[in-house]
A protein has these predicted regions:
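Short hydrophobic/small-residue motifs within alpha-helical transmembrane segments
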Residues: 17-18, 106-108
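C-terminal ends and interior cores of transmembrane alpha-helices
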Residues: 46-58
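Cytoplasmic membrane-interface "Motif A"-like loop-to-helix N-cap segments
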Residues: 33-44
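Interfacial helix-cap and linker-helix signal at transmembrane-aqueous boundaries
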Residues: 30-31, 115-124
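Intracellular juxtamembrane helix-capping segments at the cytosolic ends
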Residues: 76-89
């Protein structure tokens, strides 16, 4: 806890949302140039690096930079998933697959803040949560990288 006022802290959540909106739109052009799978690998890695920036944040400006960076990366991943699922599994399966993926994400979004608060209450720090996020991002990046060996259309 860095002693940031509640209203300012809530503003950081808005910055995550703003970054996410930008990431959802901006990734299209990048994915068209480099391919969807390389783009999602890049964005998964970017998200992990954003978590590292969060770990080192010492004030509001650094947290704001993290919020925008994380939002951009997260928004890009969210927007790429439907297209990659369509490329890999076709139209017949995409609805069920996306429903499963986004339901899993919803549980994470619902339970994550409670888990982070619980960890903070026990350890007095968010560091274990942040390092957990870094580890999960590394796993997601590695899993996404495995798709590079598959023949998935660029668009």
């Amino acid at each position: 806890d860095l002693g940031i006022a509640d209203a300012s802290a809530v503003g950081l959540v808005g910055l995550i949302g703003a970054g996410s909106v930008f990431g959802r739109f901006a990734i299209g052009g990048l994915a068209d140039r480099m391919g969807r799978v390389p783009a999602i690998v890049l964005m998964q890695a970017s998200m992990g690096l954003a978590f590292l920036a969060w770990q080192g944040a010492g004030g509001y400006a650094a947290l704001a930079a993290f919020a925008l960076w994380f939002g951009l990366s997260y928004g890009a991943v969210v927007s790429l998933m439907p297209a990659i699922c369509m490329d890999m599994f076709g139209a017949r399966a995409v609805s069920a697959i996306l429903g499963t993926l986004y339901t899993g994400a919803a549980f994470g979004n619902l339970l994550g803040p409670f888990a982070a608060g619980w960890v903070f209450d026990r350890h007095g720090s968010y560091a274990p949560v942040i390092w957990g996020c870094v580890a999960l991002s590394a796993i997601a990046t590695a899993a996404s990288s495995m798709l590079l060996a598959r023949r998935v259309p660029a668009y």
